[in-house]
Design a protein with these regions (language model features):
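Short amphipathic alpha-helical segments
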Residues: 8, 28-29, 53
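Short alpha-helical segments that sit at the start of domains
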Residues: 1-25
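Short, amphipathic alpha-helical interaction segments positioned at domain boundaries
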Residues: 78-92
């Protein structure tokens, strides 16, 4: 699976939320709100081409995120590694 900028936005939102909220997991509604506010000035916002639900499902199926006991989303080890790898590449 090739991850694009919107997938990385989702991974970053999940990781940031967990860090800022004492390891609390992010709920789907909170993830949606944060995602759309983060990309509100992006062209994809107006066309809804970001397709949030499909992206979350694909990230879940590919093992980047998990929904722990239906209480909220968190990154898997694979998701954390991918996000940190992307941050290193962007920093170069």
């Amino acid at each position: 699976m090739f991850l694009d900028k919107y997938d990385y936005v989702i991974l970053d939102i999940i990781q940031t939320y967990k860090k800022n909220n004492k390891n609390e997991l992010i709920k789907l509604s909170q993830l949606e709100t944060a995602f759309w506010s983060r990309i509100e000035h992006d062209d994809a916002q107006s066309t809804r081409s970001a397709q949030l639900g499909e992206r979350i499902a694909n990230l879940y199926l590919e093992g980047y995120i998990m929904n722990k006991s239906n209480t909220g989303y968190r990154l898997t080890k694979k998701g954390k590694e991918e996000l940190s790898f992307q941050e290193v590449e962007v920093g170069l």
